[in-house]
Amino acid sequence: MTSDIFKELNMQAHLRIARPVSDLQFAKTMYCQGLQLSVIGAFEDHQGFDGVMLGRAGMQYHFEFTHCKTQPVRAQPTAEDLIVFYLPDNHEWITSCARMLTAGFQQVAAFNPYWDLKGRTFVDADGYRVVLQNARCAIIA
């Protein structure tokens, strides 16, 4: 039903994935190198927060990483809090997995074994997980 409402309204959504991090510069470097993202925006001391937005031109999503100087928020992701990227081209997937390791991500076993069948799960310094899945997303027409 929800998808019918979006179609009816012709809604074009842009997704921002906002996460607190313990080291803003380190998170920026890891995600830029690992996922080939670029800085698309940044701010300093915005009511006590510093932040950076990472993305790519033409994409319908971006990451926002923040750090509060006055009351740092500790990240508390679970093993099932995932960002999943579908990479159906095998060469692109292998290259991307290697790039994640070079950027400082650690490869871990997925909590849900489904993600290990055709993918690899990586964790960043704050415990956030990214899955690179060597498949097409089955629900996208």
Give residue ranges: language-model regions:
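Short beta-strand/turn micro-motifs at beta-sheet edges
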Residues: 3-6, 69-73
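Core segments of cupin and vicinal oxygen chelate
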Residues: 19-61
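Short beta->alpha connector loops
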Residues: 45-46, 68-69, 89-90, 113-115
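Short, charged/polar, Gly/Pro-enriched secondary-structure boundary elements
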Residues: 58-63, 126-130
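Short acidic/polar alpha-helix capping motifs at helix-coil junctions
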Residues: 3-5, 15-18, 35, 60-63, ...
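Acetyl-CoA-dependent GNAT
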Residues: 66-71, 135-137
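Vicinal oxygen chelate
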Residues: 2-10, 13-22, 40-42, 52-57, 72-100, 118-123, ...
